[in-house]
A protein has these predicted regions:
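PLP-dependent aminotransferase class I/II
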Residues: 1-128
Length: 128
């Protein structure tokens, strides 16, 4: 089942990253809610966009693909044209600057998840 596998992958990411002081893990479940396990949107404490982009490049250089999924509305061209400025939304900007979405798909093997984790940790810790 796809959802079961996605939960397993998220659990692997979470268990491997929870002890990293720089990792801000996504909330996957609480007493009232549970994630759809569609994305694993990791945030890296204290970094800005330039650092995030360097980290992502270092991960790419290890043959792992990551992404940024949440582009703030004020950064979209239509809204820029309406006069919205990301500088008016500092919390949103901060969340955007330090977010990296890790691979999360049904066919991802445990070995591949471990490869992602190693690439991520190597990249982040070489940048901080």
């Amino acid at each position: 089942d796809t959802l079961v596998r996605r939960k397993q992958i998220c659990a692997l990411y979470a268990s491997s990253l929870k002890q990293k002081s720089w990792a801000i893990l996504p909330l996957l479940s609480s007493a009232d809610t549970e994630s759809s396990y569609h994305l694993f949107a990791l945030r890296i404490k204290g970094i800005q966009e330039e650092q995030r982009d360097r980290i992502m490049q270092k991960i790419f250089d290890q043959d792992v693909s990551v992404n940024v999924h949440f582009i703030p509305v004020p950064m979209m061209s239509f809204y820029k044209g309406l006069g919205y400025r990301i500088s008016d939304y500092p919390v949103t900007l901060s969340l955007y600057e330090n977010e990296i979405s890790l691979p999360l798909f049904y066919d991802l093997t445990d070995d591949q998840v471990n490869t992602v984790i190693r690439a991520l940790v190597n990249a982040v810790e070489s940048e901080l």
